[in-house]
Amino acid sequence: MPNRRPTIRDVAKHAGVSKSLVSLVLSDPSKVSSLRRSRVEDSIRELGYQPNLAARSLVAENRHAIGVVLGELHNPWVLEVAEVVREQLQAAGFDVLFSAAAIHDGQGIGTAELQALRDLRVSGILVVGSADDAASFESALGETPAVFVGSGREPQANTAVASIDDEQGFGLVIDHLVSGGNGQITHVSGGSGPVAALREAAYHRAMQRHGLREQVQVVEAGPSLQAGYEAVAQLLASGKRPQALACFNDLCAFGAMQALDEAGISAAVTGYDNISLSSLGRISLTSVDSDSQDLGRGSARLLLHLMRNPEGKFARQIKILPRLIVRASSEVPPRSL
């Protein structure tokens, strides 16, 4: 068996019976012959299957529920999008079940939460945050419609994607920094996840477009404040003095700004996502606004459309066009190279 919690489908396959018969054994065993009941019960014991009482109650009550998986709970952007999604889905008459995902080594959301929500027989699943682009997701979802928000994935048969145009977003960042006289622009990356890879690639292309390929420098960090702080602190300790830091997201930028402050060094800093903290006066971070309101509304509508028209031919990917919010953090006069 794969390294995951066995499902009623696994029990049925192991026992050589239908899923409905397994359900009947669990709900009303007196209606099943002793021979077939014993076969199902043996499979349940061998596989270690535990009936999901919540799922059975959902099915029995015919409730309309949608599961929302949240990754990177430390990032306010995820919560901002989730709140808009909740409002939209509840207004459409659905219950919303939230699940907090475990992030492994910065790789993004795994499949365990998707599997658990599918077992609950939800009508659809919406994932907020970076998600691995792997075939295992399709297996975990089964036939459940799903929308991935802010993800580096491509839409598949029963999925759709709502994301930010990172190519334009990082283009705006580099254009702004170059226009301010910065040529040595270091990218503080978001780690090894799919969104981090997209933004790093966009940084490379934007630098090349400005004829700055020789000035390209990437510092491996991560999506958290601590990761940004440690990466920039190590960069400065090595004796390097970048004119500007284009960071993966706002939290990473906050950490970068802290490292610069502690070292007594000035450099232009930009973030990405424009979370509410970025506008505070003492921070005043220049950031790419990914419009969490529009993204949340668009992703909820996309999921509802996918649920109602699973075989329909329509655009299964929407991209929000970002804008750059310029604040004091990027207005630092560049040092001479």
State each model region's role.
Residues M1-N3, E61, A65-D175, L236:
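Alpha-helical recognition/docking segments in bacterial nutrient-uptake
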Residues S18, H64, S123, N182-I185, ...:
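Short acidic/polar active-site loop segments enriched in Thr and Asp
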Residues L47, D119-R121, G180-G181, L235-R241:
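Glycine-rich phosphate-binding loop signature in dinucleotide/nucleotide-binding domains
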Residues L53, G71-E80, S99-G108, A162-L172, ...:
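Hinge/beta->alpha junction and helix N-cap segments in small-molecule ligand-binding domains
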Residues A237-A244, F248-L337:
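Flexible loop/turn connectors
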